[in-house]
Structure formats: structure tokens, C-alpha cells
Regions:
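Terminal, low-complexity interaction segments
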Residues: 149, 160-244
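Extended extracellular/luminal ectodomain segments enriched in beta-structured repeat modules
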Residues: 105, 114-126, 136, 197
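Surface-exposed binding patches on compact interaction domains or structured appendages
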Residues: 1-3
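Surface-exposed, low-complexity/disordered Ser/Thr/Gly/Pro/Asn-rich loops and linkers
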Residues: 69-119
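Serine-esterase "nucleophile elbow" of acetyl-processing enzymes
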Residues: 245-284, 303-305
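Extracellular carbohydrate-recognition regions
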Residues: 38-71
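A short beta-strand micro-motif common to beta-rich folds, especially ectodomain repeats
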Residues: 11-23
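Alpha-helical cap/lid subdomain in secreted, periplasmic
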Residues: 303-367
């Protein structure tokens, strides 16, 4: 197999390779053409049956997941130095790309070929991540800037098992079925250095030896796949926001269900706000069909609430709940809202809580 580095130019390129027998009596010449790069941003990954031909075999055979729409970005997995000799086990299960035998130091790598990324550019990284019981629990989002891997220190959390383990997001250990909880990853980063005729690189690196189930990682373990969930979730979306300096920064909490993740309104909100001069640091948890009351019992929802410091919170109730909260006969709906709002304000006393009424109707009109 003949491989080539990503073409960072806007024009196609070609090369000629000659194969010759050791005695020189026979030879063959092969021309290799490589298409011009597409635009690096935005790059978007949605994993479903209709896009499977774009990534299925390239992932399992070649360790490449090209963007399914948008631009020229691609995802791969890379071993850390301690595990360099061990092979990954890559698969596609119900359209989701998965990798087993990932352990501490290994990482998901996002690569974006660029002709020029200006110094001071802000790149917005969004992803949905999942892990099985014996997969790595903690990951840190890092970006390669001037040859150095950096993280956004202000957004790092501390693992309760060991304060030396700092992370950006964690996986739940339940990737499928009714009990799943996925990690919603939203990280904005500013590149101090320009990238010219090269690649913008962002990675999600496993940190700490802990599994989602609370054990110690083992590279030969089963039930240990890390994966990127299929549609309705969007796997990833990465955009270049440009070099502007926003007028202000607000921290925003988003909790909701499928109405909050099918079309990625939180990711779009972040981009729209930036264009209007506002930076949003959004933390979120989304799970399908959940009511506000059910969010109170979801570990990932309570974790993100307890991070605190929010200026705004958007709470999106389950669409089949009547939405006349203040006067509806279905008292449990009002109770769920007020209890969740009180929990938000306990960690963020000055937070403005905003209720999203998915569909507005009374209980008399239910169904």
C-alpha cells in the first residue's frame, strides 16, 4: 500500500513510483494522484447508514474517519508511547465507530489540513463521546500549538480518585441501551501560533488508569470500547471562529433531551453568539426522552450542574409534558422544574434559569 501525507494545498498533486526487480530486469511505473485539500472548517461527522460508505472500511482498515459533511478533517486513533507496539481493535457497531484496547496515554486525534490558520485563531471543538464499562473513564482535550500540546486549564476538572488527574470530560461506562449517558464535549481554544501548509491537530487523550466501572485499565480487557455515538447525536463538529476578541464571556448550562441534540442547537448557539461578539462557555448533558425530574437522577446532569458558576441555564423538558407549568393540574411537572432550578441556583446563585417549552399545551390537550 502506498500512503501519503495530507495535501494542504488548494491544487492537486501527483508523483511517480517505480517498482523494479532486484536484478533490474523488470520494472513498473505507477502514477499516484492526490486531490486538492478541501476547506478544513467546518468539519462535521454524523454516523448513520447513509454515511457509512464514507467511513466504514476506511476506519476499520486504514484508521481514518473522514468528515461526513463539510470539509477535509479526519479522525484517527493514536497509541501513547507506552503502548506503541500494541494494535488497536477498530470496529463499526450499528454505525458507530468504536475502538477497543484504548488505555491511558492513547487518544482520538482530529486532523485538519490547512494552507494557513492565522495566529490568534479560535477553533471551536464539539463532540459526543461514549465508553463501555472497562474503557478509559477520563479524557483531556488538547490542541497542538507551536509544536506543544496545550489544554484550556480553566476548564479542567479534577478526578476524585486522584487530584493529579485533570480532565476535560468523562465517560459513563454505558454506551447503549436505556441507561446510556454520553459525554457532551464543547471546548473553545485559541491558537497563539499560525499554522502554514500544515495541519491543525486536536486530540482527546485518555488520562489516569481508571475505567468507567471504577477498576484499573487492562489493554486486553473486553467490554472496553470507546466510541462516538450514531445519529441522532452528531458525532463531532469543529469550526474556525476567526481571530476576533469577544466583548464578554458567559458560562451557560444546557440540559435537555433529543430536541436539544438532534440538530445541535447548543453548538449553533455558541457559534451565533460568537458572531455577535459574545463568547459562551457551554456545559451540557443531553439524553433522549428525559423529563426535568429524570435529569435530577442522572449522574452526568447533576455533575454538570454542580460545576457551578453559570450565568444562564437552559432547561428543556420532555416534549410530551404539558407546558403550562404555573397553573397546570399536572403538579409533578411544576415540581420537577422548580426542584431542578433550585439545584442549579444552589451551585450558581446569580444564574438566570430559562425554561424551554418544547411544545406548549395544557394537560387537557395532551396527545
Amino acid at each position: 500500500k502506498i500512503g501519503a501525507d495530507a495535501n494542504t494545498k488548494t491544487a492537486p498533486r501527483s508523483a511517480v513510483v517505480t517498482f523494479a526487480s532486484t536484478d533490474g530486469s523488470k520494472s513498473a511505473t505507477v502514477r499516484v494522484d492526490q486531490q486538492a485539500r478541501g476547506e478544513a472548517f467546518p468539519s462535521k461527522w454524523v454516523f448513520q447508514a447513509s454515511t457509512l460508505p464514507l467511513y466504514g472500511s476506511s476506519w476499520t482498515d486504514d484508521n481514518v474517519i473522514p468528515a461526513t459533511s463539510g470539509a477535509a478533517g479526519f479522525i484517527s486513533v493514536v497509541r501513547g508511547d507506552a503502548n506503541a507496539s500494541a494494535a488497536f481493535k477498530r470496529s463499526v457497531v450499528t454505525n458507530r465507530p468504536a475502538v477497543s484496547t484504548m488505555v491511558e496515554g492513547d487518544y482520538w486525534l482530529y486532523t485538519f489540513p490547512v494552507e494557513n490558520l492565522a495566529a490568534g485563531s479560535v477553533v471551536d471543538f464539539n463532540a459526543t463521546m461514549a465508553g463501555e464499562a472497562n474503557s478509559p473513564k477520563y479524557f483531556i482535550v488538547e490542541y497542538l500549538d507551536g509544536g506543544v500540546w496545550k489544554s484550556v486549564e480553566a476548564d479542567l476538572l479534577t478526578a476524585p480518585e486522584n487530584p493529579a488527574v485533570r480532565y476535560t470530560y468523562k465517560c459513563s461506562g454505558t454506551a447503549t441501551g436505556s441507561s446510556y449517558q454520553h459525554a457532551t464535549v464543547m471546548q473553545t481554544m485559541r491558537f497563539e501560533n499560525a499554522v502554514t501548509d500544515g495541519e491543525v491537530k486536536i486530540r482527546c487523550r485518555a488520562v489516569g488508569p481508571y475505567t468507567c466501572a471504577g477498576g484499573t485499565q487492562n489493554i486486553t480487557a473486553t467490554n472496553a470500547a470507546s466510541s462516538i455515538p450514531p445519529y441522532g447525536f452528531t458525532g463531532s463538529y469543529v469550526q474556525n471562529f476567526g481571530t476576533a476578541t469577544p466583548r464578554d464571556t458567559k458560562k451557560v448550562l444546557c440540559l435537555g433531551n433529543s430536541f436539544s441534540y438532534y440538530s445541535n442547537p447548543a453548538w449553533m448557539l455558541k457559534e451565533i453568539a460568537w458572531r455577535e461578539g459574545h463568547a459562551l462557555n457551554i456545559k451540557a448533558h443531553f439524553k433522549g426522552s428525559q423529563t426535568l425530574t429524570q435529569h435530577l437522577s442522572l449522574g452526568f446532569s447533576t455533575d454538570v450542574i454542580e460545576q457551578g458558576g453559570y450565568d444562564f441555564a437552559f432547561l428543556q423538558d420532555q416534549s410530551q409534558n404539558p407546558a403550562n407549568y404555573g397553573r397546570d393540574a399536572t403538579a409533578s411537572i411544576l415540581t420537577g422544574l422548580t426542584t431542578l432550578a433550585d439545584k442549579v441556583r444552589a451551585a450558581s446563585p446569580s444564574c438566570k434559569v430559562i425554561l424551554e417549552e418544547t411544545w406548549t399545551f395544557s394537560s387537557a390537550s395532551y396527545g
